[in-house]
Amino acid sequence: MEAAGELEPEVLILGSAADGKLGQVVVGSTADRLLHSSPVPMAISPRGYRGSKAGGLTRITAAYPGTPDTLYVVERVAALAERLGVPMRVVTFAVRGRTMYPPEVGLSTEDSILEQLATHARETLAQLKVDGVVGKDVDLQVVSGNGWDESLDNADWQEGDLLAIGTSPVGGIARVFLGSRGSKILRHSPVPVLVLPG
């Protein structure tokens, strides 16, 4: 982090740790320390990732949970996509937990609650265009699945995609600090992830 302070990089780029599942981001001890202390964005690729055959970045996806404190992720990704001349999309993940409710409540109740969450997420995403946060051409999607792994797999990735996620500030300091949701997205992402300090 000392070198980052002196060199003032725009982003730190890391590969995944050598152990773990191929095709997913594997956070080793060095990356973990950096993920909890970096004042600059960090990019980390899935284990075994070889890059795009197309020769570069083709689209940036902002993971947006729809909360006001994470709007900065969408704004920063919109600026980055414009600067790099690539399309952007915004995705909200509606994830069915392993067990959302006791069995006596019933699966139809879980389905109903998940659909209500997805409906609210679609309305929140649509508001991004109404408010001018993103352009009319930005793709907005709610992606669901049974667990984080299935949800991330269902996100219709393209070769050359980059996923951007936000973090929470620690004690008012803009540093990378992944919450549980961000950690799960990072761990299950099949594409490189850009982690933006909050």
Model-based region annotation:
Residues 4, 81, 125-133, 155:
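Conserved hydrophobic residues forming the short capping helix/wall of the S-adenosyl-L-methionine
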Residues 58-111, 131-133, 137-141, 160, ...:
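Small/aliphatic-rich secondary-structure junction motif
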Residues 25, 55, 73, 100-104, ...:
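Short, well-ordered secondary-structure micro-motifs
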Residues 32, 78, 126, 130, ...:
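Active-site phosphate/pyrophosphate- and oxyanion-stabilizing loops and adjacent acidic/basic residues
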Residues 108-123:
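A short acidic, glycine-rich active-site loop
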Residues 1-52, 154-198:
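Gly/Ser-rich helix-loop-strand patches that form or flank binding pockets
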Residues 73, 120-128:
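Short, well-ordered amphipathic alpha-helical segments that serve as non-catalytic structural scaffolds
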Residues 142-151:
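Charged docking surfaces used in two-component/phosphorelay signaling
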